[in-house]
Amino acid sequence: MSQRDTPAELIARSNRLGADPRNTNYAGGNTSAKGEVTDPVTSQPTELLWVKGSGGDLGTLTESGLAVLRLDRLRALVDVYPGVEREDEMVAAFDYCLHGRGGAAPSIDTAMHGLVDAPHIDHLHPDSGIALATAADGEALTKECFGDRVAWVDWRRPGFQLGLDIAEVKRRNPQAIGVVLGGHGITAWGDTSEECEAHSLEIIRTAAEFIETHGRAEPFGAVVAGFEALPEAERRAKAAALAPVVRGLASTDAPQLGHFTDSDVVLEFLSREKLRPLAELGTSCPDHFLRTKVRPLVVDLPAGASVEETVVRLKELHAAYREEYAGYYQRHATPESPAMRGADPAIVLVPGVGMFSFGKDKQTARVAGEFYVNAINVMRGAEAVSTYAPIDESEKFRIEYWSLEEAKLQRMPKPKPLAGRVALVTGAGS
Ligand SMILES: [Zn+2]
């Protein structure tokens, strides 16, 4: 295949992988390919890296979403890398490695794609892979599941050092087709684009089958009497009655739009013994925190509680949530941390009824709900084969209030004055 086809092949692979929600969460993960082109300045052959840039989703990735970097320069950064304490500085250095105009802005994961010595690399966030990655004995389970075909990399926040860690693990395990990244996801590689994709799917499917065949029957514990899903009509009526109240509470700091989900996955989780302890442990994949916050608000009343009782309890729980969130911020914030972004929950779980999710617009609200469904799947998988053990709260905070993430938020267009507000127009039909 000629080198001109390398980006097209990468886009096609990314779109296929991103189209199946079992492979990665919305806008999660990134892919890359390396290849040789003729440098128009020197007429000499030069090696390039095409890698999904910052933002965007694999399922709809196009060529304009790829960052294009010179591999010789990217690899030379290893010699000036000042160490893990200052690894964030390396992101600015990526701009000095761009080829031509460079395409999309390079993401924090660019180091992993450049430093790991393989022509094609996929980094993904599949529920099955994260389930192993967040199991208390994830390293041993990865060995049991994959033998030496997939290696383990201890949790580390995404960045330059994680790229170096994965590159080293690959060097020490030349037979491996990829790695499980503790607390986070998976990375797979291949000599060709087809091989890389096949390796990604092999890891995702093997992990899912392992959980299926080795997992215990009721990972979330027994159904708690009274917390079963209400019949659909009753459930929807209660959701409709609660929706404006929940949205009002979730909009205390800033106007939010809401989304409601009462899928079987959600209702089943809400009916089980382990709902509250697991919800309290919070999500783990680095992508999740900015969308769902670390923890949801969980209503602790049975499904049959009246709307009035539930509203009273929601207000109490919301006040407690805000206090707890401010405590979490104060426990971990340093003088360099961005200011607290608001203490309202992004996810509200009501047993018997369903899940409300919130965001600054409709799409963000829906995606927050999708991410929490990912988190439920991850917790179920981890609890099936082991004990769910997400990364430490301090690490979660470091990601939620990461200065690089903050910079990304600041670059996003400011919401329009009426965004997130709902207007009721009456008498307009005359
Ligand atoms: Zn990731």
Could you say what each language-model-derived stretch is?
Residues 1-424:
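Glycine-rich flexible loops
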Residues 429-430:
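Conserved glycine-rich cofactor-binding loop
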